[in-house]
């Protein structure tokens, strides 16, 4: 289901002329970086889940290794937007990470109506311009010197 959500987002971003970059490793805090007009945005994508008839967006990562569970809450230092993908309705919730940081585990999608398919939030804004899409590697690694 996670891949379906990513594919849905990818289709919508490409229709809107975004460039999409994905990490080589799967276990990263960033699912993809998008670029348009020189503006880079880091995205985390989660599939909307239904529990007891209610749809919720999980806002943390739970991983386990050899019986040890780790819970990670995403921050604005790591990502710019959280994308909730409802694969039953093909709706995408475009949520700034500042909203996500206010919740511990999940958000009911009934409170997220403003963010439903609101792709305008991802469009480059005046004053929100980095040095360009060619600098994706530098943004990911912090390395301004290139590969050594």
Residue ranges and their predicted role:
Residues 27-31:
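Beta-rich nucleic-acid/ligand-interaction surfaces
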Residues 46-92:
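Catalytic cores of nucleic-acid endonucleases
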Residues 89, 93-144:
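Non-catalytic C-terminal interaction segments of nucleic acid-processing enzymes
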